[in-house]
Regions:
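N-terminal helix-turn-helix DNA-binding core of bacterial DNA-binding proteins
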Residues: 3, 7-54, 81, 89
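C-terminal regulatory/oligomerization modules of transcriptional regulators
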Residues: 1-9, 64, 69, 86-132
Length: 132
């Protein structure tokens, strides 16, 4: 079967989805929620370095895309749980595999970066200063 041409609108649609699910914070949140529902502060503690605002934006985006549900329990104080939807659970396995791959190859990537940086750092230029 010959390859089908890509429509610009299809590429833009896929790009917007990949921008959401490929975002580093989304990847961490999806990986965590794969183990079951979690509360906001629990997610924040487990995802090191994420601000409250960024976690809020990430969860809202995932909820908007139908990947996460937000359940408010009528308790005092209110309890809010986040969990993956069926659609989100379908994404969990590839995201988990991506996270595992990154973890397994972290040292190799860091070595490659260091080699690249050494090859591409500007050479020290001699200074033409006159000693006084």
């Amino acid at each position: 079967m010959p390859p089908q041409p890509h429509l610009d609108s299809d590429c833009r649609g896929v790009a917007s989805i990949l921008a959401r699910v490929g975002d580093k914070w989304s990847v961490f949140v999806i990986m965590l929620l794969g183990d079951g529902p979690r509360r906001f502060n629990e997610i924040k503690r487990m995802v090191g370095g994420i601000s409250q605002r960024m976690l809020t934006l990430t969860l809202r985006g995932l909820e908007r895309d139908g990947l996460v549900t937000r359940t408010v329990f009528p308790t005092i104080p209110p309890r809010v749980d986040y969990e993956l939807t069926d659609l989100g659970r379908g994404l969990w396995q590839p995201v988990e595999a991506l996270g595992k791959w990154a973890s397994d190859h972290q040292a190799e990537i860091e070595d490659a970066r260091a080699r690249f940086d050494r090859r591409n750092e500007p050479a020290d230029l001699p200074t033409n200063r006159v000693a006084r």
